[in-house]
């Protein structure tokens, strides 16, 4: 009887261990599912964050005015149209909305080593000043009388000749003879500075004279 009772109770002791194993496997599966969901959620949040930053960056760049737009505003009501003529006679035009890599002077970096380069600058406004920078301005004359077109011949630091054709009207008081070379402009600035110093010395001398005259009385 005791052996039969012992054999009958033995399966009852095995059953709880199997149930514990099943519960443990279920818990592990739930934890793995939760962890995978958390990783997916973090990945989605990171993608949304990166996409928001990139969208804001594109929006800021779209709102920022371009250099071409600023140049158009400074040029006036009409656009600035530039044409380049090389030695072969071919011409190329560049508009403010184009993708040509030219600056305000219309100099193409690809043709900077050419012997000569002729440029036409069409301005719908008034030419206020003509400045050559390091280039020495040699000549300015009318291409044809009455057509408001002026040709400026300039020589660069590398002894290359450049001719600029300006279409427009010169302001009042500015003619062909009033445009001087950089050397003449430097001399004029020196002369004005010396005249200003002379006037300051005279004013100081007069002030000292009046002060001395007042102290004597």
From Swiss-Prot:
Residues 191-211 are annotated as: Basic motif. It comes from the Eukaryota. Residues 89-109 have a biased composition (Low complexity). Transmembrane segments: none annotated. GO terms for molecular function: DNA-binding transcription factor activity, RNA polymerase II-specific; RNA polymerase II cis-regulatory region sequence-specific DNA binding. This protein binds the cAMP response element (CRE), a sequence present in many viral and cellular promoters. Could regulate the transcriptional activity of genes involved in regeneration processes. Belongs to the bZIP family. In contrast to other proteins of the family, the C-terminus is shorter and lacks the leucine-zipper. Binds DNA as a dimer. This is Cyclic AMP-responsive element-binding protein.
